[in-house]
Amino acid sequence: MLDLKRIRTDFDSVAEKLATRGVDAATLSQMKTIDKERRDLLVKVEELKAERNTVSAEIAQAKRNKENTDDKIAAMQKLSAEVKNLDASLAELDAKLTEFTTTLPNIPHDSVPVGADENENVEVRRWGTPHQFDFEAKAHWDLGEDLDILDWERGAKVTGARFLFYKGLGARLERAIYNFMLDEHGKEGYTEVITPYMVNHDSMFGTGQYPKFKEDTFELSDTNFVLIPTAEVPLTNYYRDEILDGKELPIYFTAMSPSFRSEAGSAGRDTRGLIRLHQFHKVEMVKFAKPEESYEELEKMTANAENILQKLNLPYRVVALCTGDMGFSAAKTYDLEVWIPAQNTYREISSCSNTEDFQARRAQIRYRDEADGKVKLLHTLNGSGLAVGRTVAAILENYQNEDGSVTIPEVLRPYMGGLEVIAPK
């Protein structure tokens, strides 16, 4: 959620930055007008309340003096009615302001490239060289079916499209991957957490999914619960409405959880394979940091995600998202895209973002600065470390052999009882 004070005092700059995210300046101008109307009305209400208090004191004094108070009581009743009406008007203006502030995206950091969509993202660096096969590379969904480790047909029968069963060595591979990821993040100082897989609406508001992106989620009817779209939601809301000791920062959390997404608007995209599912596992990283340290922490978090890909020896590139392609809550985002041979392209496998104080303001997560004792909003960061299903896809395709088998990356073999190859039966 944006800071109204910043919009008031730095309107032109904020409007210019939000315009790069598709926000019409007229929308901000309307918001500014409503805010001024509210502040002017608030002054009037306070003046009337002060006047009412004065009249109330005069009535009390008149009663002590046994004087007639009818006129003063009538005046106070009139003032009370005016205050009540103005309070109702204030409530309406507050609702309008809330609608604005909760649906406007975050202000992009100065270092974010300006652009309309993913075509204007900027490549930062590459690691590894895409493997050139001397045979025709298979897609991971064909490899998974041929090896009898992934079953989409029965996933569709049991549930529907974009669901699958991992079975046998496929299930073991997935488990090996996320255990490896969690162990690596643990070495970097992250505290491992097992979160609830359902959260309430306040939590969804805190991280920015609600109210704007309700259509992307699975709500449990007749309850206040939502299936989590990412562990970012419960991890970030862990400290909702709390004040932390500044000496404890930064705090690092990591969690593996299922993620549930309706994929609204994705009809026809990635209809086969592990890239876009309604339910998938993901290892998440979340940080709570002081504002002056948050961008250094973003670089570290991105490096933590890169470390996983490097140890798996999967070629990838890092991309800085442009203003038009960033997520709603992000002030700056790096995407990690892994090489997918059958598609002859890089595909997103991680997204690491600094939301600055955007989520902290919504969730009221603050810290007491040990330097001056003041309570301040902290910065929150989140990143995938990594999307597990997409990592399975990348391993199957990059480690495939001409005979249809798949070599297990060396770092995963201890998690699979020393197994080196998944071979056709």
UniProtKB/Swiss-Prot annotation:
Record has Glycoprotein as a keyword: no
Database matches in InterPro entries: aa-tRNA-synt_IIb, aa-tRNA-synth_II, aa-tRNA-synth_II/BPL/LPL, Ser-tRNA-ligase_type_1, Ser-tRNA-synth_1_N, SerRS_1_N_sf, SerRS_core, tRNA-bd_arm
Binding positions (L-serine): T230, A231, E232, E284, S384
Chief subcellular location: cytoplasm
GO molecular function: ATP binding; catalytic activity, acting on a protein; serine-tRNA ligase activity; transferase activity
Keyword presence, Nucleotide-binding: yes
Catalytic reaction annotation: tRNA(Ser) + L-serine + ATP = L-seryl-tRNA(Ser) + AMP + diphosphate + H(+); tRNA(Sec) + L-serine + ATP = L-seryl-tRNA(Sec) + AMP + diphosphate + H(+)
Family indicated by similarity: Belongs to the class-II aminoacyl-tRNA synthetase family. Type-1 seryl-tRNA synthetase subfamily.
Function: Catalyzes the attachment of serine to tRNA(Ser). Is also able to aminoacylate tRNA(Sec) with serine, to form the misacylated tRNA L-seryl-tRNA(Sec), which will be further converted into selenocysteinyl-tRNA(Sec).
Name recorded for this polypeptide: Serine--tRNA ligase
Organism: Streptococcus sanguinis (strain SK36)
Record gene name: serS
